[in-house]
Amino acid sequence: MLRRTVSNFAMSPYMLFISDLAKTGKLKGIRTPGKFVGKKYRQLSAKEKAALQQRAKQASTPAMTAYRRMAHREMSNKSVPIEQRRANLTKKWNETKQAQRAKAQKAQKKPKSAKSKVKKAAKKAKKSKK
C-alpha cells in the first residue's frame, strides 16, 4: 500500500519536461500542447532523457515530504497493530487533503466587490447628516 501511494506522488521525467517547457514559454499559443510535448519528448536523445530521469529521482513535492513525515510519525507507534496504523494513516492523510482542498477553494473565491460597503457608508453618512 505505501509503496503504491508514494509512487503516485513521485515526479516523472515527462512531468519535469512539461514543466520545463511551460517555464520557458514554449507552450504558449499552441492549440494542442499535449501532442506537441509528446512529440518533443520522443525526440529527446538518450542522454537528455537520462538527465531528466536523474532530476526526477531527486525531485520531491511538498505532498510527498508531508506524507512521508506523517507516515513515519504514525508508523512509529509500535503499540498499535500495523493494520490499525495503516488505517489511521490513511484516515489522517485523507483529512489533511480535504482540508487543503477546502483551503485552496476558499482562496480561489473572488473577493466581494466594495460596492455594497460603499452604499452602506453612503447611507450612514446620509442618516448622520439628518
From Swiss-Prot:
SMART domains from the UniProt entry: HMG
Q: Which InterPro entries match?
A: HMG_box_dom, HMG_box_dom_sf, Kinetoplast-DNA-binding
Q: Which Gene3D superfamilies does the protein's record reference? A: High mobility group box domain
User: Can you name a GO cellular component term?
Assistant: kinetoplast
Q: Which UniProt keywords apply?
A: DNA-binding, Kinetoplast, Mitochondrion
Query: Could you name the domain of life of the organism this protein comes from?
Result: Eukaryota
Q: Major location, coarse class?
A: mitochondrion
For bias type Basic residues, the affected ranges are: 103-130
**Which cystines does this chain contain?**
none
MF terms (GO), sorted A to Z: DNA binding
Q: Where is the signal peptide?
A: none
Which residues are propeptide? 1-10
Location in or out of the cell: Mitochondrion matrix, Kinetoplast
Q: Locate the region Disordered.
A: 95-130
Q: Which family does it belong to?
A: Belongs to the KAP family.
User: How is the quaternary structure described?
Assistant: Associates with the kinetoplast DNA network.
What role does it play? Histone H1-like DNA-binding protein involved in the organization and segregation of kinetoplast DNA (kDNA). The mitochondrial DNA of kinetoplastid protozoa consists of about 5,000 minicircles and 20 to 30 maxicircles. These circular DNAs are held together by catenation into a highly organized compact disk structure referred to as a kinetoplast DNA (kDNA) network. Binds preferentially to a specific fragment of minicircle DNA and is able to compact kDNA networks through DNA charge neutralization and condensation.
According to UniProt, the name of this protein is kinetoplast-associated protein 2-2
Organism phylogeny: Eukaryota, Discoba, Euglenozoa, Kinetoplastea, Metakinetoplastina
